[in-house]
Amino acid sequence: MSSVSRREFSAQALGSLMTFSLLETLFECEAFGKEVQPITARWLNELNDLGRDLRDEAMSQVAWQEKVEELFGEVNLAELLKFVDLEQLAAEAKLVEKGARSLRCSFPKIEGLPTNLVFGKQIFAVKNRRSVVPHGHNNMATAFLVLDGTFAGKHYDRVEDEEDHIIIKPTIDRGFAQGECSTVSDYKDNVHWFKATAEPGFLFNIH
């Protein structure tokens, strides 16, 4: 595993705030109606506070995972996602027979919201019974959010790195539906594997 300082990790992890980036994107696209924008704005601010705590080393990686998942539980994300045009997204996505189609997304600045976040973001479009390739991460906090469809999700702790393989231990094995998320860090649930159990399946990912 490559070496990285805590400060360098925190800077990367700050850019990995999945929920902040997704909702920021939806705000840009005016995907939310006026009746839900105040709720979403509060949510964004709370998520940004979590990112600031992580950046300032006031929060551990695992605590960040727990808080992000807890915050998801406080808002009916499935209801908010009804304001997103997933039908259009499904019509435009060209699903592949193997693996997942990666759809790049971008958005301009939003007045009044934090800027200068550095992160990678994408939406995975997956056919039924196809998977995002199982993988693990080094020096990264990342997360997946189910936008549409259902998935069989598996996570593993990364116990030890050997010269030509890694030793892992199962931690999560369950179904994931719209609005549910999972998180990853160096210390918890590092390896993950998502297989679509309905079509189309869409996952929003920040890495």
Task: Give a label for each model feature.
Residues A141-A152:
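Glycine- and acidic-residue-biased ligand/ion/polar-headgroup-sensing regions
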Residues Q122-H137, D186-K188:
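Conserved short histidine dyad/triad with adjacent acidic residue
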Residues K98-N128:
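A short glycine-rich, His/Asp/Glu-containing loop-to-beta-strand
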Residues M1-L17:
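N-terminal secretory signal peptides and thylakoid transit peptides that target proteins
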Residues W193-A196:
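Asparagine-centered strand-capping/turn motif at beta-strand->loop junctions
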Residues E160-K188:
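Short acidic-glycine-tyrosine-enriched beta hairpin
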Residues L23-V62:
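C-terminal segment of N-terminal export signals and the immediately downstream linker at the start
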Residues A143-L145, A198-H207:
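A short hydrophobic beta-strand segment most commonly corresponding to one strand
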